[in-house]
Protein backbone atom coordinates (compact mmCIF):
# COMPACT_ATOMS: atom_id res chain seq x y z
CA UNK A 1 0.00 0.00 0.00
CA UNK A 2 1.18 3.49 -0.83
CA UNK A 3 2.65 5.78 1.81
CA UNK A 4 0.29 8.52 3.05
CA UNK A 5 1.34 11.98 4.16
CA UNK A 6 -0.33 14.35 6.61
CA UNK A 7 -0.26 17.43 4.41
CA UNK A 8 -3.54 19.22 3.82
CA UNK A 9 -5.23 18.48 0.52
CA UNK A 10 -7.68 16.23 -1.26
CA UNK A 11 -5.93 12.90 -1.78
CA UNK A 12 -7.74 9.68 -0.94
CA UNK A 13 -6.32 6.15 -0.60
CA UNK A 14 -6.86 5.45 -4.29
CA UNK A 15 -4.92 8.60 -5.24
CA UNK A 16 -1.83 7.48 -3.33
CA UNK A 17 -2.10 4.03 -4.90
CA UNK A 18 -2.45 5.53 -8.39
CA UNK A 19 0.65 7.69 -7.91
CA UNK A 20 2.60 4.69 -6.64
CA UNK A 21 1.45 2.61 -9.63
CA UNK A 22 2.46 5.33 -12.12
CA UNK A 23 5.85 5.72 -10.46
CA UNK A 24 6.47 1.96 -10.32
CA UNK A 25 6.98 2.02 -14.10
CA UNK A 26 9.91 4.43 -13.64
CA UNK A 27 11.84 2.76 -10.82
CA UNK A 28 14.30 1.15 -13.24
CA UNK A 29 15.29 4.50 -14.78
CA UNK A 30 18.56 6.33 -14.17
CA UNK A 31 16.66 9.56 -13.50
CA UNK A 32 13.02 10.69 -13.44
CA UNK A 33 11.68 14.20 -13.97
CA UNK A 34 8.14 15.02 -12.78
CA UNK A 35 6.23 18.18 -13.70
CA UNK A 36 3.10 18.88 -11.65
CA UNK A 37 0.54 21.56 -12.44
CA UNK A 38 -1.59 22.36 -9.39
CA UNK A 39 0.29 22.15 -6.09
CA UNK A 40 -2.34 23.31 -3.57
CA UNK A 41 -0.22 22.53 -0.45
CA UNK A 42 2.23 20.00 -1.94
CA UNK A 43 0.47 16.79 -0.93
CA UNK A 44 0.70 15.09 -4.33
CA UNK A 45 4.22 16.40 -5.05
CA UNK A 46 5.36 14.76 -1.83
CA UNK A 47 3.48 11.58 -2.71
CA UNK A 48 5.45 11.47 -6.00
CA UNK A 49 8.68 12.20 -4.11
CA UNK A 50 7.99 9.34 -1.70
CA UNK A 51 6.99 6.93 -4.49
CA UNK A 52 10.21 7.67 -6.40
CA UNK A 53 12.53 7.54 -3.37
CA UNK A 54 14.56 4.61 -4.73
CA UNK A 55 15.52 6.36 -7.99
CA UNK A 56 17.21 9.72 -8.59
CA UNK A 57 14.49 12.22 -9.47
CA UNK A 58 13.35 15.81 -9.35
CA UNK A 59 9.86 17.27 -9.10
CA UNK A 60 8.85 20.69 -10.36
CA UNK A 61 5.44 21.77 -9.16
CA UNK A 62 3.55 24.89 -10.18
CA UNK A 63 0.58 26.72 -8.68
CA UNK A 64 -0.72 30.25 -9.01
CA UNK A 65 -1.11 30.49 -5.20
CA UNK A 66 -4.35 32.41 -4.99
CA UNK A 67 -5.42 30.66 -1.82
CA UNK A 68 -8.28 28.20 -1.78
CA UNK A 69 -11.85 28.53 -0.53
CA UNK A 70 -13.51 25.61 -2.32
CA UNK A 71 -17.06 25.27 -3.56
CA UNK A 72 -19.90 27.24 -2.00
CA UNK A 73 -22.48 25.62 0.26
CA UNK A 74 -24.98 25.99 -2.57
CA UNK A 75 -22.83 23.98 -4.97
CA UNK A 76 -22.14 21.35 -2.31
CA UNK A 77 -25.87 20.99 -1.69
CA UNK A 78 -26.63 20.92 -5.43
CA UNK A 79 -24.12 18.06 -5.83
CA UNK A 80 -25.65 16.21 -2.88
CA UNK A 81 -22.44 16.23 -0.85
CA UNK A 82 -22.65 15.89 2.91
CA UNK A 83 -21.35 17.72 5.97
CA UNK A 84 -18.16 15.63 5.88
CA UNK A 85 -17.32 17.21 2.53
CA UNK A 86 -18.04 20.67 3.95
CA UNK A 87 -15.73 19.94 6.88
CA UNK A 88 -12.96 18.84 4.49
CA UNK A 89 -13.49 21.99 2.44
CA UNK A 90 -13.30 24.19 5.51
CA UNK A 91 -10.15 22.45 6.77
CA UNK A 92 -8.43 23.06 3.42
CA UNK A 93 -9.24 26.77 3.07
CA UNK A 94 -6.40 29.27 2.99
CA UNK A 95 -5.33 32.71 1.92
CA UNK A 96 -2.76 33.11 -0.85
CA UNK A 97 -0.07 33.88 1.71
CA UNK A 98 -0.95 30.85 3.85
CA UNK A 99 -0.88 28.59 0.80
CA UNK A 100 2.49 29.92 -0.37
CA UNK A 101 4.07 29.56 3.08
CA UNK A 102 2.61 26.09 3.63
CA UNK A 103 3.93 24.81 0.29
CA UNK A 104 7.45 25.97 1.13
CA UNK A 105 7.29 24.43 4.60
CA UNK A 106 6.00 21.13 3.21
CA UNK A 107 8.62 20.72 0.48
CA UNK A 108 11.56 21.82 2.64
CA UNK A 109 14.52 19.41 2.39
CA UNK A 110 13.02 17.58 -0.61
CA UNK A 111 14.15 17.65 -4.22
CA UNK A 112 11.05 19.60 -5.20
CA UNK A 113 11.07 23.00 -6.90
CA UNK A 114 7.99 25.17 -6.52
CA UNK A 115 7.04 27.77 -9.14
CA UNK A 116 4.49 30.39 -8.07
CA UNK A 117 2.90 31.05 -11.45
CA UNK A 118 -0.13 30.25 -13.59
CA UNK A 119 0.33 27.43 -16.05
CA UNK A 120 -0.65 28.19 -19.62
CA UNK A 121 0.13 26.72 -23.00
CA UNK A 122 3.42 28.10 -24.28
CA UNK A 123 4.89 28.57 -20.79
CA UNK A 124 8.71 28.55 -20.87
CA UNK A 125 9.24 25.45 -18.76
CA UNK A 126 12.26 24.65 -16.68
CA UNK A 127 11.51 21.01 -17.56
CA UNK A 128 11.64 20.57 -21.33
CA UNK A 129 10.41 16.99 -21.51
CA UNK A 130 9.32 15.54 -18.17
CA UNK A 131 8.89 11.79 -17.76
CA UNK A 132 5.66 12.30 -15.81
CA UNK A 133 3.26 15.22 -16.11
CA UNK A 134 0.66 15.35 -13.34
CA UNK A 135 -2.15 17.78 -14.08
CA UNK A 136 -4.33 18.81 -11.15
CA UNK A 137 -4.83 22.46 -12.08
CA UNK A 138 -8.00 24.47 -12.53
CA UNK A 139 -9.87 21.58 -14.21
CA UNK A 140 -11.37 24.03 -16.70
CA UNK A 141 -12.11 22.87 -20.23
CA UNK A 142 -9.59 25.28 -21.73
CA UNK A 143 -6.74 24.41 -19.36
CA UNK A 144 -7.39 20.67 -19.73
CA UNK A 145 -7.46 21.01 -23.52
CA UNK A 146 -4.21 22.96 -23.38
CA UNK A 147 -2.44 20.36 -21.23
CA UNK A 148 -3.47 17.70 -23.74
CA UNK A 149 -2.06 19.83 -26.55
CA UNK A 150 1.17 20.43 -24.60
CA UNK A 151 1.45 16.70 -23.96
CA UNK A 152 0.89 15.82 -27.61
CA UNK A 153 3.88 18.01 -28.47
CA UNK A 154 6.32 16.43 -25.98
CA UNK A 155 5.01 12.88 -25.65
CA UNK A 156 7.30 10.05 -26.59
CA UNK A 157 7.21 6.39 -25.66
CA UNK A 158 7.91 5.84 -21.99
CA UNK A 159 6.46 9.12 -20.74
CA UNK A 160 3.16 9.48 -18.87
CA UNK A 161 0.45 12.12 -18.51
CA UNK A 162 -1.82 11.81 -15.47
CA UNK A 163 -4.92 14.02 -15.25
CA UNK A 164 -6.62 14.21 -11.85
CA UNK A 165 -10.37 14.67 -11.37
CA UNK A 166 -11.25 14.52 -15.06
CA UNK A 167 -14.98 13.92 -15.31
CA UNK A 168 -15.63 14.87 -18.90
CA UNK A 169 -14.81 17.39 -21.53
Regions found by a protein language model. Name each.
Residues 2-9, 16-169:
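S-adenosylmethionine/decaboxylated-SAM
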Amino acid sequence: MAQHNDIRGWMMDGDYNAIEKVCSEFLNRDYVEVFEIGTLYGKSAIAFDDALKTVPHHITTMDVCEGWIGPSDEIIEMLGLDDNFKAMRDANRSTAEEQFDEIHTNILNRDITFIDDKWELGYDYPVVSPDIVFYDGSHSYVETRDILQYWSEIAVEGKVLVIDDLIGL
